Design a protein with these regions (language model features):
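Membrane-embedded catalytic cores of phosphoryl/pyrophosphoryl-handling enzymes
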Residues: 118-211
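Membrane-interfacial catalytic/cofactor-binding modules of polytopic membrane enzymes
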Residues: 74-156
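Hydrophobic alpha-helical transmembrane segments
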Residues: 31-43, 66, 141-150
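Alpha-helical transmembrane segments of integral membrane proteins
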Residues: 27-30, 56-60, 161-171
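Hydrophobic alpha-helical segments and helix pairs
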Residues: 6-49
Length: 211
């Protein structure tokens, strides 16, 4: 698979096993679990502190979110937690990546989240996966993409404290997408690029939108 050719190894397979220490695992899970709270916090900040731009900021967030899911309809890529489960970790470790055809049309089984299994945030991630994680929504990473939009909106707000508060959650969220095997590294990179592109495109399209 091209990720192995680009990075020299499979990040989604080796990241968690290399950094399996409980505090690191919990920080990763905390970052991933912070996804929806980040969206809510940015929206609430604009509502209470910059109400004139609340409608614009909300539109940018929601439009970004739904654009990713439209992409997933036309580019159905299975994340590693689903693909590795389907083909077996031994095949992945040996550099063999068999095609699975329409397997994910009828199967949604995934690997358990790697890391410290007794952690509070680990449990939150497992609950989130059970409630809403689906096989073919991996490329680009909407978690990285929409959280990148959140960071740009925090920057746009001019509130340095908001930006600095969100920064560590964003950092660990981006890493966690690969660490917990929800995404391949290339998915996270694509999420960063597309999230930035969506932010500027949607902000340009909504220049005249005010409450």
């Amino acid at each position: 698979m091209y990720k192995r050719q680009v990075f020299g190894f499979q990040p989604a397979l080796t990241f968690a096993s290399t950094f399996s220490w409980a505090p690191i695992s919990e920080l990763m899970s905390m970052g991933y679990a912070a996804y929806y709270p980040m969206i809510g916090l940015v929206a609430f900040y604009y509502f209470f502190a910059r109400y004139k731009e609340f409608e614009r900021a909300s539109f940018v967030l929601l439009a970004s979110f739904f654009i990713y899911y439209i992409v997933f309809i036309f580019v159905p890529v299975a994340g590693p937690t689903f693909y590795f489960k389907a083909v077996g970790l031994e095949n992945i470790a040996n550099g063999f990546f068999p095609a699975v055809g329409t397997y994910f049309n009828t199967h949604q089984e995934c690997l358990p989240t790697p890391g410290y299994v007794d952690g509070f945030f680990y449990d939150l991630v497992e609950q989130a996966k059970a409630a809403g994680e689906r096989p073919t929504a991996a490329f680009p990473s909407s978690h990285v993409g929409v959280s990148t939009v959140c960071m740009w909106l925090a920057y746009h707000s001019g509130n340095r404290r908001l930006l600095l508060f969100l920064a560590p959650f964003y950092f660990f969220l981006c890493l966690a997408t690969v660490y917990i095997q929800a995404h391949y590294a290339i998915d996270a990179i694509a999420g960063l690029i597309t999230g930035t592109a969506l932010y500027f495109a949607l902000m340009y399209a909504t220049k005249g939108l005010k409450c």
